[in-house]
């Protein structure tokens, strides 16, 4: 079993700490659908088209198609767009 790095509880993707072959069990109860290169993102849950993609607990992109758990998340299925953000200042 391979262990994926999840950086924040809000994250719906994890990071591959090494190359992960297709069809391998990984933690979080999923199997890799694709080959996932070292350092790349893998979906930890179903992400619908138009949903935000979270890493570090922050929005890093928007899915441009449905993404299944275990699927490689990269420029082919993730895009960027402007959206309203809320900022919290700590004084």
Question: Where are the regions a protein language model picked out?
Answer:
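Conserved SET/PR domain catalytic loop and adjacent active-site segment
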Residues: 4-7, 12-87
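Short acidic DE-rich linear segments
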Residues: 90-91
């Amino acid at each position: 079993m391979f262990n994926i790095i999840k950086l924040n509880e809000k994250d719906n993707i994890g990071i591959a700490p090494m190359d992960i072959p297709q069809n391998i069990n990984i933690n979080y109860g999923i199997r890799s659908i694709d080959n996932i290169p070292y350092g790349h993102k893998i979906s930890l849950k179903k992400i619908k088209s138009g949903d935000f993609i979270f890493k570090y607990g922050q929005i890093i992109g928007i899915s441009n198609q449905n993404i299944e758990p275990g699927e490689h998340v990269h420029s082919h299925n993730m895009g960027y767009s402007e959206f309203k953000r809320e900022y919290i200042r700590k004084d």
